[in-house]
Structure formats: C-alpha cells, structure tokens
C-alpha cells in the first residue's frame, strides 16, 4: 500500500479547483468531491491489482484519477473492460451506502457529475476506454485507435462549443483532455508497432484465430494466419520476417 501511495500525484488542475472552491467557502463540497474521486480511482486500482497489472503512476484530476500502467498492450480485452468500468461501479456502490447517512444535498450532484464526465467518450476517460474495447471486438487494433481518437476529438469539439461561456473549469479540463487525445493520436503508429513487437517477443496464448491478408487487420485477443501472395504464413513467421528486416523499434 505504501508503494502505491508513493505513486500518487496531484495534478495542478486539481489544486486550482480545490483553491477556487475553498475561496468560495465550499468546504463540504470539495471534501465529498475528493472523497468520491478517490473512491472511484480505488475501484480501478483494486481490480487492476487482481489482474496483477503494474502501476506506474496515479494522477488525481478534478474529474477523477488517471492511473498509468506498465502493462502489455496485448492484455486481454475482458481485463481492460473490467478495469475501465470498475471505477464507476465502485463509486456507485459506495455512494448508495453513504447517501443514507450523509445530510448534504449536493452529494448526488457530485456523484453524477463524476460518473457522467468519466463516461464521456474522450480518451483517456473511462467512456473512451470502454468504447475502445468495443471497437477492438469488432475491428482491428489499428482501426480501434483511430476511431477512439476521432470520437474523442468530436466530443471535445461539441462540448467546447456548449461550455465555453458556461463553465470555465470544465472547459479547462477539456483543454487537458485535448492534449491527451492529441498525444494518443500522434503515438498511434508507435502503439501499433509495440502491439506487434510484443507478439514477436512474448509467448502469448490466444484461443481464437483469424485469417487475414494485411498486418493492419490484426486484432487483439486473436492469433492470426496470413495469406499473402498465394501463400499461408503463421503470425510468428510473419513477425519474424518483419522485425528481422526492420530491426528493433
């Protein structure tokens, strides 16, 4: 537990938000806000530890936490889904319990704001991660990254038009999220190459197999059989040829 506490980082946006609410005299508001944010992130952390994910850093933001993992890209989709949704479920369960004993009318607003905001399809929010799992179920890994980034950009654009003159704090959060989405989009080729290189260097087991004719069609949770130039080739053989020629990343 001490090791995890050492990895917690309070983002400047969170400190600004706390300062603003303290100036406004909203001590109870910020207290319950922080409590629900920490409970939300605790849900992610507990489930990730069950799957033995390695935690690099836990960033606490005004809308929740952002836990960065040192984890294989080829992690099973079911694990990604359960870790992504666990924060919302854990927070909701906690809220249902404490709501009976807390006499503060704004607790429900805080709870639903955190839930709704985290369900927005903007990377790296929970909503976008869950959506990315869905995309990975129906299309290739490469397409999933692109689709997640496009939907994230569009959501930020429309929310910015609505909130620019309404809520400056949320607008600042959208600017932060835009930077995160932009980095995610710029690194899509690097992520794809890491996705391939992991399969080349690790003995990964998959129950399902798929026949494809292009490396861009590779999917998570699948082993692939390539059919190129009228020849069949196993995934291992294809990746060996690819990285023997290109060398390391």
Language model features with spans:
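Hydrophobic transmembrane alpha-helices and their immediate loop junctions
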Residues: 1-249
